[in-house]
Amino acid sequence: MATFDHPFLPNAGPPIRKMMLDAIGVASIEELYSDIPAQVRTNHPLKVDWLPSEQEVKSHLERVLAENKSASDMPIFLGGGIYNHYLPAAVKAILGRTEFQTSYTPYQAEISQGLLQSLFEFQSMIADLTQMDAVNSSLYDGSTALGEAARMASRATGRKKILVPRSLHPAKLSVLKNYTEPAGIGLETFMYDKETGGVSSADLQSKVDRDTAAVYCEVPSFFGILDQEVANVPSICHSRGALSIVGFDPISLGGLKPPGEYGADIVIAEGQSISTEMNFGGPALGIIGCRGENLIRQLPGRLIGMTTTLDGKEKAFSMVLQTREQHIRREKATSNICTNEALFAIGAAAYLSLLGPKGLRQLFESILVKTSYAIKMLSELPGVVVPRFTSPHYQEFVASFKGTKGTLARLNKSLLSNGVHGGKSLVKDFPELGESALFCVTETHSAEAIDKLRLLIEKLQEA
């Protein structure tokens, strides 16, 4: 029987090591590493002062982890794309089911009828929410969904210009550039109205031309603005042969008009808020849908459809469109998306099923009320301008600290040391807004947490 030199690495024993070297035709470890120059190798034993037991390692790691602070330890007013919503226990239980706990769609997918039906239900619910003809079975996240939408629009129109708002999340813009630049698609920015924070219709209309493939708008915007002007954008686009892409927040459609009702051609969203927790920023859930057969055939990824068994006696589900490059000729594919976010799509279906239309509306109204309460509380502070813009806000709002003492960075640091995570600084990405921050409020924020934020800012101003 072979003897092992290491309790956790049985292959480190000399007999097994020799067998492996013989199998690859190498005489020694030295010969195996001969391609690595001697001057860059470590030629002395590593100095390891601490050789702990398993118990000591566990205790050490627990002490290190105890220094972390989670959303359950302090109120977090940081949003900007990933949000602290309450995820029902039933959704977590479904996500943990062994039948679902993989983001991978089986290659013999029709064997997994339960998985396909769950994805079909997800597609159907999002299509109903948005009033789109088709929704795919998920993309990586909201940013990549926007990238795919831009390429869809360019293919469908044969044009090479996409208009995006100046208020677009900088990280989302960066991902969008990664998708458009290799395809020769140019991006142009249209401004937001300095008073309302919404779309500047005059600036937009001056930039939509016969080279424009699509215009992208968001409701709510990155600034949290519920912009009524977005409803007029599709008609502006269509009058010039362009498409309208609208970004939405799934929970907000519990109370807002669906994008399909005012003419959006393609919709995209980040579905993290209805499918999974913050998870340090990912993984998330990309949502994309569209109207019209021409655009449906340009959708990336997979579509799950409902059909019948061969004998026609039972309902069944199958993949009806698979335009990924692994399934069809590469030059005919719409995208190289591989493993998608099927697990979180199922989580979203479970979430929407649990809440239903009435529950989703109640949640939307709750967030709306708490957002208004936070705005009211902060607006009472001297030197703080809240909201920075006059439009209605949902879940997020911009606060200007131009009239207060000190910098926003100092304020956020002080808030954190007092057990509150402040808003996202906009100083670097939106210098035209001065010392401003984006604050986020969801159903998880109590009135006491909002009051604590106000009180701390007030005390820090007096210090």
Residue ranges: model-predicted function:
Residues 97-109, 125-132, 157-158, 182-189, ...:
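Gly-rich Lys/Arg/Thr-decorated short loops/hinges at beta-loop-alpha junctions or inter-strand turns
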Residues 274-382, 387-390:
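Active-site C-terminal subdomain of aminotransferase-like
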Residues 8-9, 144-316, 399, 409-413, ...:
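Conserved PLP-enzyme active-site core in the AAT-like
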Residues 1-16, 20, 314:
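Charged, compositionally biased N-terminal leader segments and the immediate start
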Residues 34-121, 328:
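N-terminal entrance/gating region of PLP-dependent enzymes' catalytic architecture
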Residues 358-452:
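Conserved C-terminal alpha-helix-loop-beta "cap" of PLP-dependent enzymes
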Residues 107-111, 115, 127-147:
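Short loop-beta-helix segment that forms the pyridoxal 5′-phosphate
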Residues 27-40, 264-269:
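TRNA-binding/sensing appendages of the translation machinery
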